[in-house]
Amino acid sequence: MKDHAVDHGFHVHDERHFVETYSLNQVWEVDLHPEEGCGGPLDLHLALEVDPRVLLAFEDIVVDLPDDADPPDDFHFPLIFTWALPPLPSGPDLLRLAIDLAGVGRVDLPLEVSAIDSYPAATDAPERRLTIVARQQISLSKILQGEEPICDVLDRCLAVSQWLLDAAPSWLSD
């Protein structure tokens, strides 16, 4: 996944792999941003969650299939993209932002836009932190058949990232 993201114009800063000892659930996380955004205000966090029960159930189905049969498309892993920006002195209107980003993400990449206003001290002005989340389901059947369209998702994520990088300077100014 990390190498694939690099092929689509992203620069990787960090990667992590977690295994929960009780359930054996695993999460692969990658921190990245567009190549032109190095040193910029935008962070993108990618997380792939692997449930071993889903993987084992998929394996059971595949083992019992005839050689020429395709497995059912019932087994998926969540892939989550989370964009974050630093506190924004002149934060955007959230509804306008959600509408604008819907045009960038299109139907292929539905985006959730949220913000948190916090007060560092009672006498300080509020700080608005912006978060955008996209959730995708990665089909194990399509991966097995070599058809998983992750390229389209990464291209949409790059477009969203570039749009946010272009818009961020106006939100960061006082």
Stretches found by the model and what they are:
Residues 6-65:
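N-terminal interaction modules that seed assembly of large macromolecular complexes
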Residues 10-12, 30, 46-48, 79-83, ...:
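Generic structural hydrophobic/aromatic packing signal, biased to beta-strands
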Residues 24-35, 80-95, 162, 166:
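Short, charge-rich amphipathic segments
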Residues 25-27, 39-43, 74-78, 125-133:
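A general secondary-structure signal for short beta-strands and their flanking turns/coil
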Residues 33-35, 65-70, 117-124:
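Catalytic micro-motifs at enzyme active sites that drive phosphoryl/nucleotidyl and oxygen chemistry
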Residues 41-108:
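C-terminal basic regulatory modules in eukaryotic proteins
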Residues 89-174:
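Glycine-rich, aromatic-bearing surface loops/beta-hairpins
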